[in-house]
């Protein structure tokens, strides 16, 4: 399984995808709902996995080194190639539980003589792994923060207004459902803050742009170009969507409202306060959002413990306060969410 947003990114960098790909019902988040395994199996998970393994083994015949990114699964696949390999444990962090449960197999894979190096996603995890006997572990930085320089994309921002980034995620159809929920929250936030105070910019994946018109119709918004507009007799709310301005939107935002994984980590890495909302999933549920707060700390605030309805969104929007602006041209916010 591979996120189709990643496929597009690889293609843009002229990096070929050598094996078959498919979107599975679980989205790769079986630990959040193990029952989705049966749906994955029904969608051909076993045959897909076997095809991937065959592709990897054949391709490895012409390789000198395997770079595996993920968890025990990719580490095991790298081991199976019989080549030297390096593992980046991107899916594991000691911030979740204080100590990673490595089990019986993963230490053998990481301590194998063909495993040349293990990279951890943070310094705490590197220390934990070393204490558990994985002496070749290092933390040298977080790769997801490497390419977040603003490109100079014109976001048509008004400098005197607060900028709020909207991050619905990258996996469809979930990202579409997430955006519907986020648009409901945008309406409530605009009521609290005022439409002449804030402006909204959404960073979406290219495939979601094709769904914007249907999303607008379902939520009572108007759609034109890359702009979603909600009209009332008193005011208009605009959410302008971009498929190619993720870094620019994050860099210019004063607050992030999102339902995503890596994108939220990147926002926090840039020092942005973040509000998240549990959704239907399969990936961004309350369980995921709660774990994310353990990973990222108080920079992330989760609204509620279940899928938000209109009443909850209205209630929590009134608890969001933006009282401090220092200095005038560089807004900073204290975001308070009280339950």
Locate each region found by the language model.
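Nucleotide-activated sugar donor-binding and catalytic core shared by glycosyltransferases
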Residues: 1-339
């Amino acid at each position: 399984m591979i996120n189709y947003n990643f496929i597009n990114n690889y293609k843009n960098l002229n990096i070929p995808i050598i094996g078959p790909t498919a979107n599975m019902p679980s989205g790769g988040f079986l630990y959040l709902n193990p029952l989705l395994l049966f749906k994955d199996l029904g969608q051909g998970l076993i045959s897909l996995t076997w095809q991937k393994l065959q592709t990897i083994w054949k391709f490895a015949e012409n390789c000198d080194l395997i770079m595996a990114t993920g968890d025990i699964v990719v580490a095991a696949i790298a081991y199976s190639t019989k080549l030297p390999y390096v593992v980046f444990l991107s899916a594991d962090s000691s911030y979740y539980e204080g100590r990673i449960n490595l089990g019986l197999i993963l230490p053998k894979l990481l301590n194998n003589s063909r495993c040349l190096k293990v990279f951890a996603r943070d310094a705490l995890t590197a220390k934990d792994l070393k204490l558990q006997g994985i002496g070749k572990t290092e933390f040298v930085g977080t790769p997801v923060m490497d390419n977040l320089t603003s490109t100079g994309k014109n976001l048509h921002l008004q400098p005197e207004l607060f900028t709020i980034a909207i991050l619905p995620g990258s996996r469809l159809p979930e990202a579409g459902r997430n955006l519907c929920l986020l648009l409901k929250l945008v309406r409530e936030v605009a009521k609290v803050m005022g439409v002449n105070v804030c402006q909204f910019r959404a960073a979406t994946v290219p495939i979601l742009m094709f769904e914007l018109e249907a999303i607008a119709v379902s939520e009572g918004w108007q759609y034109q170009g890359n702009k979603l507009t909600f009209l009332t007799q008193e005011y208009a709310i605009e959410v302008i969507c971009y498929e190619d301005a993720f870094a620019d939107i994050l860099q210019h935002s004063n607050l992030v409202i999102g339902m995503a994984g890596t994108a939220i980590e990147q926002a926090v890495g840039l020092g942005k306060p973040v509000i998240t909302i549990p959704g239907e999933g399969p990936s961004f549920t309350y369980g995921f959002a709660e774990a994310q707060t353990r990973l990222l700390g108080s920079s992330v605030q989760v609204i509620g413990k279940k899928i938000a309805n209109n009443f909850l969104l209205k209630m929590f929007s009134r608890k969001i306060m933006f009282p401090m602006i220092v200095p005038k041209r560089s807004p900073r916010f204290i975001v308070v969410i009280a339950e």
